[in-house]
């Protein structure tokens, strides 16, 4: 009986120490970092590409405090050259942050459900010749 108990404890301890490899954060735009702890929900997300425009509405979910998530987004986006235009917070609709960068726009909506904190990122970017015309 003691052997069985010792074996059971050992097996439980070893399986508790096992970990899955970290998920790579997915972002359709290389200059829009996604904070760790968020998982993309591809069933709710939409990505559209044309010769002149790339647009995406991507949903992420996680168990992160919304206020700290808002600070993390603002800090990392500004570090990547995004200009913060505005932020609004509403008790029933969460926090909306709006950013711009040459040829690109981004809206980040952070809100809570009963279990997850959700992030809805809507981004558009001019690509190809349309982007070159904007720079002139």
Model-flagged regions — what are they?
Residues 18-136:
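An acidic-aromatic pocket/loop used at catalytic or ligand-binding sites
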Residues 1-8:
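Bacterial N-terminal signal peptides that target proteins for export
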């Amino acid at each position: 009986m003691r052997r069985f108990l010792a074996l059971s404890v050992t097996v439980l301890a070893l399986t508790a120490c096992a970990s899955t490899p970290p998920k790579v954060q997915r972002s359709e735009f290389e200059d829009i970092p996604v904070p760790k702890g968020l998982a993309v929900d591809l069933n709710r997300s939409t990505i559209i590409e044309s010769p002149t425009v790339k647009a995406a509405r991507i949903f992420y979910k996680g168990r992160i405090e919304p206020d700290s998530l808002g600070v993390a987004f603002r800090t990392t986006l500004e570090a990547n050259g995004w200009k913060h235009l505005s932020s609004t917070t509403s008790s029933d609709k969460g926090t909306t942050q709006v950013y711009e960068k040459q040829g690109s726009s981004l809206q980040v909506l952070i809100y809570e459900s009963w279990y997850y904190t959700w992030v809805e990122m809507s981004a558009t970017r001019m690509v190809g010749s349309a982007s070159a015309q904007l720079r002139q």
